[in-house]
Design a protein with these regions (language model features):
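An amphipathic alpha-helix adjacent to DNA-recognition modules
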Residues: 21-29, 41-42, 53, 62-86, ...
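Basic, helix-initiating cap at the start of DNA-binding domains
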Residues: 1-38, 42-51, 68-71
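Hydrophobic alpha-helical connector segments
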Residues: 72, 83-114, 164, 168-171, ...
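Short secondary-structure transition hinges
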Residues: 107-147, 154-157
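C-terminal peripheral helix-coil segments that are non-catalytic and often amphipathic
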Residues: 1-11, 101, 105-108, 142-143, ...
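Amphipathic alpha-helical segments enriched in hydrophobic/aromatic and basic residues
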Residues: 35, 44-45, 55-56, 66, ...
């Protein structure tokens, strides 16, 4: 056996980096489970480190505050939404099918993880309103929808009478508006409203048909 092909022992720096990654992941997983069960406000840092079986000092080595941890989880949620939309675009060809499929998936996931979703979405929206990092997350959401609309314009199922940026604003604004209404109104029929919104947007953005003769 060639000695050069044998596995090389990890350096102390490599082991420290691996342990750090593992600790980070354990904190995130423990926090997510607790936020899902109790909500953000009812969960303390001591609760999180206890569930993760880590020292409090380790938590603060990774996150300066509990709010910073929630922000990282919120960013991950937006990344998950981006992947869902990308996957839906690979499965479907029309704007109506893409928005309908994506809105349906998101609505189902949000309602299943209701407590956690409320905290994460509130964090994104509050951060945006105060000029914080939530702005970045909302920009990512808008950019993802912009790509879907731009593709629809190229395929011909989205009209070109409005500017692309306006159309992207309409889609992102409608999606966020429905989610906001769900956040603020107990019992709001999120899944149904998202489905209706997707259908409305597809119809509103469809190319205008030229008037027929005699009309």
């Amino acid at each position: 056996m060639d000695p050069s092909s044998a596995p090389q022992p990890r350096s102390p720096a490599d082991r420290r980096h691996r342990r750090s990654r593992q600790s980070h992941a354990r904190i995130r997983a423990a926090a997510r489970n607790l936020f899902l069960e109790r909500g953000f406000d009812a969960t303390t840092v001591d609760d999180i480190v206890g569930a993760a079986d880590l020292a409090q000092k380790t938590f603060f080595n990774h996150f300066p505050t509990k709010d910073a941890l929630l922000q990282e989880l919120a960013s991950s949620v937006v990344g998950h939404f981006e992947r869902l939309l990308s996957d839906e675009c690979k499965r479907s060809d029309s704007l109506e099918a893409r928005l309908g499929g994506f809105f349906s998936l998101v609505g189902s996931e949000i309602e299943v993880t209701r407590v956690l979703s409320r905290d994460l979405l509130h964090r994104i929206i509050r951060g945006s309103a105060s000029g914080g990092t939530g702005n970045q997350e909302l920009r990512r959401v808008r950019q993802a929808f912009r790509g879907v609309v731009a593709d629809g314009r190229e395929r011909g199922d989205v009209g070109v009478d409005l500017e692309l940026e306006v159309q992207a604003d309409l889609v992102a604004g409608a999606f966020i508006g429905v989610v906001l209404q769900w956040l603020n109104e107990p019992g709001y029929p999120l899944a149904g409203r998202l489905r209706e919104t997707a259908n409305f947007l597809a119809a509103a953005l469809a190319p205008r048909r030229a008037p027929g003769r005699g009309t």
